[in-house]
Amino acid sequence: MSAAKNILLFGATGTIGTFILDALLPVRSQFGRIAIFTSPHTAKTKTAQLDKLKKQGVEVIIGNVEDEEAVKSAYAGIDTVISALGRNTLAQQILLIRLAAASKDVKWFLPSEYGTDIKYGPASANEKPHQQKLKVRAYLENEISRDDLDFSYVVTGPFAEMYLNLVPGIEEAGGWDVKARKAVLLGDKGAEISLTTMKDVGTLVLNTLLHATGETRNSALCVNSFTTTPDKIQAEFERQLGGQEWDVSRTSLARLRELETEAWETGKPAATGVTLRRIWTEGGTLYAKRSNGAIGEPKVMGLEEVVANEIARVSKL
């Protein structure tokens, strides 16, 4: 199988797309073309950022992702497409996939799968936050021939940085407030959770591109930075901050489920986040084996560095 050579990235200036592009640029010489597809609005509001990217050898293609002709034109000469579209625009990937399969050039598509595993177990099919990703997967797997387009799902589990933050308006749903020295731990004391930093999402996507094998194509690659527990995270905060006293409470899984139901019934914007935290607390991030080895076992971040970064971030606020 041929490795990625000419790459097009959708959502490059978004939350995760930025980290993916940041991982690609230092090894720019290993690829032919690196292009991004961005909206006219972004072209107007992020001019300085796009100009900097152009100087780094990135092609900037301006268009609307719903404009078939614009997307077809962008696909010319591209063999690998990476989507980093956000949760609210996931369904737009179906058009991007259809056009990629019809293109004579595009051979590999990485949809926006960064985050919770949407096919972890039987219950996953009914989880509200998963529905758009499930539709995209169903289309890609059932409606598109592998003769026309290969795929890879880079499944990272929760982002470490976001997991650390208390859920706005629903603090019982877990997180850490470094300034207030307050922590809400989820689940039983020994309950593990697997996390991936946003920087490592970029690293893991890059290494997927560099390892085009039968194992990495047409499969879900469940990768991560590290596995820990809420109690270990708390202990690391206390260690780095000199053992200062914290206000620590714990939310049981049963209580988290109650909070989830209440959030959906009252229409709280944080409902999706609470559902995801319930899934993670149930163990929906844990595997007997990771796919990091299939993509070259890249160097990733650890708990100590993540906690240090969070402390540094908060100190600047």
Q: What is each PLM-predicted segment?
A:
Residues R28, A43-K44, D51-K55, I78, ...:
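N-terminal Rossmann-like NAD(P) cofactor-binding subdomain of oxidoreductases
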Residues S2-R33, F37-A48, E68-E69, T116-E245, ...:
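Oxidoreductase cofactor-interface core, primarily capturing Rossmann-like NAD(P)-dependent enzymes
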